[in-house]
């Protein structure tokens, strides 16, 4: 079976399932599809790494962090647009994430309209690759 890119699939990677639901419900409410993962390792082992049009990821997770995931994907030549959402961000983390090509770095709690705007910007970016 060949892997096909899906321009409407958003991957969400957060170790807290309850915090996956908020962006998942919001994104699905505008007709986009989502897949949720509880760790960077789960995302890397899935076909979503090749299919998703963008990735929403938490910075701090057990095992591989969101920043480490971003670096690994970049090193492998994967150009999936990444949106970071975190409750534990600081200016240094933001600088690292944005410097490595993140679409945005949002702090929890985030504004729903802002997240949707950023997701649409990420989807546009992925369509231009």
Annotate each predicted stretch with a short phrase.
Residues 68, 89-104:
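Alpha4 helix (beta4-alpha4-beta5 surface) of REC/receiver domains from two-component response regulators
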Residues 6-18, 23-27, 55:
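Conserved acidic segment of CheY-like receiver
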Residues 92, 110-120:
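C-terminal output helix
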Residues 38-39, 65-68:
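Acidic catalytic/metal-coordinating carboxylates
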Residues 61:
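Receiver (REC) domain active-site loop signature in two-component systems and cognate sites
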Residues 36-54:
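Acidic, metal-coordinating helix/loop segments flanking the phosphotransfer/catalytic sites
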């Amino acid at each position: 079976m060949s892997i096909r890119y899906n321009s409407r699939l958003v991957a969400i990677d957060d170790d807290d399932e309850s915090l996956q639901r908020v962006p998942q419900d919001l994104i699905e409410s505008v007709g986009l599809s989502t897949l949720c993962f509880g760790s960077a390792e789960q995302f890397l082992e899935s076909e979503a790494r090749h299919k998703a049009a963008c990735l929403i990821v938490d910075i701090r997770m057990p095992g591989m962090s969101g920043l480490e995931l971003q670096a690994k994907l970049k090193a492998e030549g994967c150009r999936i647009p990444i949106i970071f959402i975190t409750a534990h961000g600081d200016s240094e983390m933001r600088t690292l994430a944005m410097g490595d090509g993140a679409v945005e770095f949002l702090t929890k709690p985030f504004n729903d309209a802002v997240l949707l705007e950023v997701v649409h910007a990420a989807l546009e970016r992925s369509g231009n690759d």
